[in-house]
Amino acid sequence: MYKNIKKFKLESFIAQEIGNLIVSRGIKDPRIHSFLTVVKVEFSKDLINAKVFIGSIKEGASLDNAVKALNNAKGFIQSQIIKRIKVRSTPKLLFVKDDSLSKSFYVNKIIEGLNTIREN
């Protein structure tokens, strides 16, 4: 039970810190824009590896390039996280593209289209 609570707190903290770095432009890479969002963070059972799912709230944004840039900057990101958290070792980060936001935008467009057809 305790490990699950610790894991949940660590996942939410990591997501928040990475989100803050993205929004505050702490990562100096033009491929990383403020429309990126951390969808979720999943830790391995041993809390050594963390998979960070990245989405974009802007339609048509180049998510592939942003994920590559984040993976290139993961050493810097890990160093920033270790300054703010008290753990024995920093989790190894892996950034992964998450299309769930773009899919939800697509579904919303379809629903809006159906609503306009219904109104006419």
UniProtKB/Swiss-Prot annotation:
It holds the Pfam family RBFA. Signal peptide: none annotated. It comes from the Bacteria. GO terms for cellular component: cytosol. Coiled coil: none annotated. Its main location: cytoplasm. GO terms for molecular function: ribosomal small subunit binding. GO terms for biological process: maturation of SSU-rRNA. It is found in: Cytoplasm. InterPro entries: KH_dom-like_a/b, RbfA, RbfA_dom_sf, Ribosome-bd_factorA_CS. Keywords: Cytoplasm, Ribosome biogenesis. Belongs to the RbfA family. NCBIfam families: rbfA. One of several proteins that assist in the late maturation steps of the functional core of the 30S ribosomal subunit. Associates with free 30S ribosomal subunits (but not with 30S subunits that are part of 70S ribosomes or polysomes). Required for efficient processing of 16S rRNA. May interact with the 5'-terminal helix region of 16S rRNA. Monomer. Binds 30S ribosomal subunits, but not 50S ribosomal subunits or 70S ribosomes. This is Ribosome-binding factor A. It comes from Borreliella afzelii (strain PKo) (Borrelia afzelii).
